[in-house]
From Swiss-Prot:
This is Homoserine O-succinyltransferase. Pathway: Amino-acid biosynthesis; L-methionine biosynthesis via de novo pathway; O-succinyl-L-homoserine from L-homoserine: step 1/1. Residues 69-383 form the AB hydrolase-1 domain. Substrate binds at R245, D378. It is found in: Cytoplasm. The lineage of its organism: Bacteria, Pseudomonadati, Pseudomonadota, Betaproteobacteria, Burkholderiales.
Length: 415
């Protein structure tokens, strides 16, 4: 077991968990991250080694004395460890899955101890390309190692070790987070009792890899990118990152959802309805995408975008078994819940059905729900009653099996 330490150089607000004091019914309360430092080298799939690193985490609920009620939530591309509750630093910063995690919510923190981990390579507190490379004293930039989903799982396992958690009650995630949950079930089968995979896939299609490549090229060809070392130049490849986000955002929405939100509505049309016959914003959808792109470029790191999209491309557990997904999933001993959404064309329901068929072939216990929802891939983030009922029911079954009926008895500060 590795022995992480809390970073003593960080502000006091980040040196220890802030108790989640609910500010409203169903809220996980005001939360702040903990920064764990790991000095044990982490071997990576690329053959490189990361000698030391920090991971930003948040926790919700209380770890029981038996350490059996822990749930790991894995995040998608542009999310972070801030899964639920309200940030202590910004009252407007609500966790990205706050409708899913909290007291009385589908993942009920009166019963479960939930951990959110910001992945290596991200830009929200964990070690990544913008961090200082101890060998040079400068930001890593493009020299930061390329990572895989499996690398993230190995790093997350050390967080579990830190808390003394031998086996998670569940590991769950949506989209890229679902890939991490699946990887946990394959690579650490003895440590996962339940695997919850939402709006995900066992591998990216050529189309998805193509979208990622176009987004990366937008960033890399931005004159302000400087080969990934833009930190030293005091620039940000904001134009490229904005375009990358615009491309990605289109893939997260369904055609029907975009038609309902925007249709062909014009932005400030002329009184006579004539076109402007120019290349500035003409339609509402253009304005929306530009806004999303520009907002994203102000808070996300371009090198992180490159790194995470490449990790998405590389994920393919069946690659090691000649394309046989059932064989790739054979080590898994967990029970599974898979959820897909009817209008998700980024990771369509057929990809979830493929995983279900492979699991059934192996005799794995699996529950599958395909939710009829109009919102495309982003439906996994929304408060859909049918979707949440499925997840709630699954976690209630886990709670019954573990004897978690109501709030757990505190053991003390687990960190």
């Amino acid at each position: 077991m590795t022995n992480p330490v809390l970073n003593p150089a960080l502000p006091a607000t980040a040196a220890a968990p802030v108790a989640a004091t609910p500010s409203a019914v169903g809220s996980a309360g005001i939360v702040a991250p903990v920064f764990l430092r790991f000095d044990e080298p982490l071997p990576l799939a690329s053959g490189q080694t990361l000698d030391g690193y920090e991971l930003a985490i948040e926790t919700y609920g209380t770890l029981n004395a038996q350490r059996t009620n822990a749930v790991l939530v894995c995040h998608a591309l542009n999310a972070s460890h801030h899964v639920a509750g309200v940030s202590a630093d910004n009252p407007k910063d609500v966790g990205w899955w706050d409708n899913m995690v909290g007291p009385g919510k589908p993942v009920d923190t009166n019963r479960y101890f939930v951990i959110g981990v910001n992945n290596l390579g991200s830009c929200f507190g964990s070690t990544g390309p913008a961090s200082i490379n101890p060998a040079t004293g400068r930001p890593w930039g493009a020299a930061f190692p390329v990572l895989t989903v499996e690398d993230w799982v190995r790093a997350q396992a050390r967080v579990a070790d830190h808390f003394g958690i031998e086996r998670f009650a569940a590991v769950m995630g949506g989209s890229l987070g679902g890939m991490q949950a699946l990887s946990w079930a394959i690579t650490c089968p003895q440590r996962v009792a339940n695997c919850v995979v939402v709006a995900s896939t066992p591998r990216l299609s050529a189309q998805n890899i193509g979208f990622n490549e176009v987004a990366r090229r937008a960033i890399i060809t931005d004159p302000d990118f400087h080969g990934g070392d833009y930190y030293a130049h005091g620039t940000v490849p904001g134009r490229g990152l904005s375009v990358a986000r615009m491309i990605g955002h289109i893939t997260y929405l369904s055609d029907d959802d975009m038609a309902e939100k925007f249709g062909r509505t014009r932005r400030e049309p002329a009184a006579d309805g004539a076109y402007r016959y120019g290349y500035d914003v003409e339609f509402e959808v253009e304005s929306y995408l530009r806004y999303q792109g520009e907002k994203f470029s102000r808070y996300f790191d371009a090198n992180t975008y490159l790194l995470i999209t490449r990790a998405l491309d590389y994920f393919d557990p069946a690659r090691a078994t000649g394309g046989d997904l059932a064989r790739a999933l054979a080590p898994a001993t967990a029970d599974f819940l898979l959820v897909s959404f009817s209008t998700d064309w980024r990771f369509p329901p057929e990809r979830s059905r493929e995983m279900v068929r492979a699991l059934l072939k192996n005799g794995s216990p699996v529950t599958y729900a395909e939710i009829d929802a109009p919102h495309g891939h982003d439906a996994f983030l929304l408060d859909d009653a049918r979707y949440h009922a499925v997840v709630r029911g699954y976690y209630e079954r886990i709670a019954r099996e573990l004897g978690l009926n109501g709030a757990v008895a505190p053991e003390g500060n687990p960190a």
